[in-house]
């Protein structure tokens, strides 16, 4: 009876397996492209694999078709049909396939390259990209260069990666790196289950996929579809000559295993002839620093006697125990993954050992193994909405540019012609900020798709053949500050909303060379009555000339009056008091601008003296731009009403005609950046001084956030804006971008993004929502600068942004790789670790994960006390918060504390 039950069980397994194979043979979700196959040829089914291949012509807009010239007669290799033709790319630096995929689904992506001397030229070498990220280098010039499936690719190679797309579109790009021509024979995508090849980050680049047999590999030993329902390519691993092959005709139950292992793989193995021997295998990888993920597939394929036991331990690289005791399941597939920060040896060699335990009577073995390298894809793709919109625009105008392939914005060296993009953090999707389609040969009306580029700041459509009206939606694009429509055939009136924005200095609008008028009523001036109006043109022109002359005279008169006294009408909101200086007085203070101290985006800063004994720094606005005046006014208004020991003091200002000047107290030790990585970094700051500067800056910022009413957000915290007096006391400066923020139930201000690259809060950058936590992020970046003396952005590092770089280094747990070596280890490690943890919490990508400035200020004071106690004194450090520090206010400008 037991035998009958076993037969029934095995029969059910076979039925299930056959059903699985039939279901899988429909190749649902498979993408199989025969690259170079003409568009007009019909799809076909390859005889040897049963796979349905079709032309790649609908998935790429460039390249030419070629056919291999030779097959390897010596080895008897006969390439399957998809690998006999190819697509090569003699033009363009980057050529990309664009494929529609299922977002969030894991795909096996395979690219096959069979050279076959198709062009009778030099074998090529080029790069392969997955979206905007480097995948691998294809090197057919090196005969030993990583040809994995050599038995069936004698004149080529294949690359595989398991990748989960983050959108419904996937770009696979071939990038020219030298003088040779990139090409590809086949591109194959296979959807996989999401519970098999998993990673917390990155994708899995295939190194090897083996099953173990004693015979040397042959063409027939390659196993793929239809045996493998996922079309994985399995190559035989030539086992030790002293091993013995075993196999079974009894079906192995693979239904309990998510990997859907083929019967042709899991029913075979090779074991040591001596039961006490260790089962070992070794292989090499190109980069020893890569994390390696290994999947070991087992099944007991021998009918064991009651007295038999097969038990062994699994060791990685001779010393890391993966399993102390493991026994394969009898006629059932099982997988043991090794994927926790596993690395090979320093020489790039990896090893796996299966060692028999004392209680085992049978030798160990492994049926099959897959080895992957972790491929970190750090650069995010351009915002999906922007990409979709841009492709709609491309289709509307039939734009054909050689480099309009792949991701529009990244990598930066391949940015599409006519675009500028924001690309501040690799972890944040770039956004399209500028379009310059001048002289693109555009025809038709201005497409409404443009309005969906909601981060667009500049739009240049000049010198095309555009017709129709100027659309109203341009005035509703909140960030748009420049529009050039010159040199087209646009007609009708310009929307009044756009004209109002231009009049108020909110936008630059260029529209000459069109049939446009400035009066909305001109659109109705058609029909018979229009001839009478034309008779009035000479009269109106004469009247207009007289009007212009009068207007010019009035304007000259106004300008002369403005030179005599400052304007008050347009600047009435600025506080006017005794600290207002004339430009002549400024010239006296600076001794005719004799001694420049530095130059920045605002203008030049000069040294000066007030009352012959008080040194000051005089900042002169370089030109009277609208934005410059706005920042000037914001800074004066703020500094006239708030006073704090850690905020720079405004001595006075000048607002006279075109002359805008700010006069500050003189900070003799410059700014913090100069002492960390600039001209003064040769005399490094001690850890104590660094902590004091950080704590004092935090106190000034805390005061802005909770000591003012309305509370203020600085928006431009950076080491260059932290000034140091003769005692190295820190004072926060440059308040031109500062904004008040709401209290009560409102949590943020929606505003255009402003700030400095590297210091800018990524959440604010992404959402346009400004909160006090945006300042906290910027301060966290400064604190990392203070600890490391590293630049905020450095493209030569493993991670370009300082926050990502420190996080990367922290995974090794060695603080010495992070701390500024110029401190020579002279610091209290506990205070430094606490400051480092605080900095990393400040630069959390999510504002909800950041502390507020009061918490930051208090923790820095504790760090400072710890450091001072190590040195045996407090060194004049006061642990009070910034609100308890000595402050002074004019009687009419006392801010309310919340």
Curated annotation (Swiss-Prot):
Extracellular side: 25-535
Membrane topology: Single-pass type I membrane protein
Gene3D superfamilies reported for this sequence: Galactose-binding lectin, Phosphorylase Kinase, domain 1, Ribonuclease Inhibitor, Transferase(Phosphotransferase) domain 1
GO terms for cellular component: membrane
Molecular function in Gene Ontology: ATP binding; protein serine kinase activity; protein serine/threonine kinase activity
Span of domain Protein kinase: 591-864
Chain positions of LRR repeats: 455-477, 479-501, 505-526
Ranges of compositional bias, category Basic and acidic residues: 868-881
Intervals, Cytoplasmic compartment: 557-898
Family, as annotated: Belongs to the protein kinase superfamily. Ser/Thr protein kinase family.
Origin organism lineage: Eukaryota, Viridiplantae, Streptophyta, Embryophyta, Tracheophyta
Record-annotated membrane-spanning stretches: 536-556
Chain positions with Phosphoserine modification: 750
Keywords: ATP-binding, Glycoprotein, Kinase, Leucine-rich repeat, Membrane, Nucleotide-binding, Phosphoprotein, Receptor, Repeat, Serine/threonine-protein kinase, Signal, Transferase, Transmembrane, Transmembrane helix
SMART domains referenced in this protein's UniProt entry, alphabetically: S_TKc
Entry-annotated residues carrying Phosphotyrosine: 664, 764
Protein name: Probable LRR receptor-like serine/threonine-protein kinase At4g20450
Record: residues binding ATP: 597-605, 619
Subcellular location: Membrane
């Amino acid at each position: 009876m037991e035998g009958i039950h076993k037969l029934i069980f095995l029969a059910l397994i076979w039925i299930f397996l056959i059903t699985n194979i039939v279901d899988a043979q429909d190749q649902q979700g498979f993408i199989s492209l025969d690259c170079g196959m003409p568009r007009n040829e019909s799809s076909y089914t390859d005889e040897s694999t049963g796979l349905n291949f079709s032309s790649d012509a609908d998935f790429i807009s460039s390249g030419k078709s070629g056919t291999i010239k030779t097959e390897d007669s010596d080895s008897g290799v006969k390439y399957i049909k998809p690998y006999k033709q190819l697509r090569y790319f003699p033009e363009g630096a980057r050529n990309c396939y664009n494929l529609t995929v299922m977002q969030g689904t894991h795909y096996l992506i395979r690219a096959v390259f069979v050279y076959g001397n198709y062009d009778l030229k030099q074998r090529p070498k080029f790069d392969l990209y997955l979206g905007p990220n480097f995948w691998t280098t294809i090197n057919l010039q090196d005969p030993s260069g990583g040809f994995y499936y050599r038995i069936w690719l004698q004149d080529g190679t294949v690359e595989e990666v398991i990748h989960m797309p983050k959108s419904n579109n996937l770009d696979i790009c071939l990038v020219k790196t030298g003088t040779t021509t990139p090409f590809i024979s086949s591109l194959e995508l296979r959807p996989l289950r999401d519970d098999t090849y998993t990673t917390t980050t990155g994708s899995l680049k295939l190194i090897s996929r083996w099953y173990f047999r004693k015979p040397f590999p042959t063409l027939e030993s390659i196993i793929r579809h239809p045996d493998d329902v996922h079309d994985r390519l399995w190559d035989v691993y030539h086992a030790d000559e002293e091993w013995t092959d075993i196999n079974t005709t009894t079906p192995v139950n693979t239904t309990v295993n998510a990997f859907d292992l083929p019967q042709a793989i899991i029913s075979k193995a090779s074991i040591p002839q001596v039961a006490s021997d260790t089962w070992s295998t070794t292989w090499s990888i190109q980069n020893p620093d890569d994390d390696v993920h290994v999947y070991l597939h087992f099944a007991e394929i021998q009918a064991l006697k009651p007295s038999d036991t097969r038990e062994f331990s699994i060791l990685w690289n001779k010393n890391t125990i993966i399993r102390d005791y493991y026994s394969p399941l009898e006629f059932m597939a099982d997988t043991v993954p090794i994927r926790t920060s596993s690395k090979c040896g320093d020489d790039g060699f990896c090893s796996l050992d299966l060692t028999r335990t004392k209680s085992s009577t049978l030798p160990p073995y492994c049926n099959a193994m897959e080895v992957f390298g972790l491929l970190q894809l750090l650069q995010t793709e351009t915002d999906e909405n922007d990409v979709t919109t841009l492709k709609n625009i491309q289709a509307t105008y039939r734009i054909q540019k050689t480099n309009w392939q792949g991701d529009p914005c990244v990598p930066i060296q391949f940015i599409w012609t006519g675009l500028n993009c924001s690309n501040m953090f690799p972890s944040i999707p770039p956004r399209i900020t500028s379009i310059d389609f001048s002289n693109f040969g555009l025809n038709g009306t201005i497409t409404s798709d443009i309005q969906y580029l909601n981060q667009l700041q500049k739009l240049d459509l000049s010198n095309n053949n555009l017709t129709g009206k100027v659309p109203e939606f341009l005035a509703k694009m909140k960030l748009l500050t420049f529009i050039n429509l010159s040199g087209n055939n646009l007609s009708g009136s310009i929307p009044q909303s756009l004209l109002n924005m231009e009049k108020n200095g909110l936008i630059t609008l260029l529209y000459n060379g069109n049939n446009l008028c400035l009066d909305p009523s001109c659109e109705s001036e058609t029909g018979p009555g229009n001839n009478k109006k034309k008779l009035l043109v000479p009269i109106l022109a004469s009247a207009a000339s007289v009007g212009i002359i009068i207007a010019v005279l009035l304007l000259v008169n106004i300008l002369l009056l403005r030179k005599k006294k400052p304007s008050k009408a347009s600047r009435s909101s600025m506080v006017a008091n005794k600290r207002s200086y004339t430009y002549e007085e400024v010239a006296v203070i600076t001794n005719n601008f004799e001694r420049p101290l530095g130059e920045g985006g605002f203008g030049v800063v000069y040294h000066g003296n007030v009352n012959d004994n008080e040194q000051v720094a005089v900042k002169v606005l370089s030109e009277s731009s609208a934005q410059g005046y706005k920042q000037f006014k914001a800074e004066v208004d703020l500094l006239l009403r708030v006073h704090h020991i850690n905020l720079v003091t405004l001595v006075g200002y000048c607002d006279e005609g075109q002359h805008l000047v700010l006069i500050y107290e003189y900070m003799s030790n410059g700014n913090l950046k100069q002492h960390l990585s600039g001209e003064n970094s040769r005399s490094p700051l001690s850890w104590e001084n660094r902590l004091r500067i950080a704590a004092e800056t935090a106190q000034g910022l805390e005061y802005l956030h909770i000591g003012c009413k309305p509370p203020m957000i600085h928006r431009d915290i950076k080491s260059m804006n932290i000034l140091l007096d003769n005692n190295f006391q820190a004072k926060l400066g440059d308040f031109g971008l500062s904004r008040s923020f709401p209290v009560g139930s409102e949590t943020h201000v929606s505003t255009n993004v402003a700030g400095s690259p590297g210091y800018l809060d990524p959440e604010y950058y992404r959402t346009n929502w400004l909160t006090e936590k945006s300042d906290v992020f910027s301060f966290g970046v400064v604190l990392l600068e203070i600890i490391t003396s590293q630049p905020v952005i450095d493209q030569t590092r493993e991670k370009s942004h300082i926050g990502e770089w420190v996080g990367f280094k922290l995974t090794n747990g060695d603080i010495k790789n992070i701390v500024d070596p110029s401190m020579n280890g002279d610091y209290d490690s506990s205070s430094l670790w606490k400051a480092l943890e605080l900095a990393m919490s400040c630069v959390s990508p999510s504002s909800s994960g950041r502390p507020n400035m009061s918490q930051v200020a208090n923790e820095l004071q504790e760090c400072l006390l710890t450091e001072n106690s190590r040195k045996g004194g407090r060194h004049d450090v006061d642990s009070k918060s910034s609100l308890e520090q000595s402050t002074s206010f004019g009687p009419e400008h006392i801010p309310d504390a919340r």
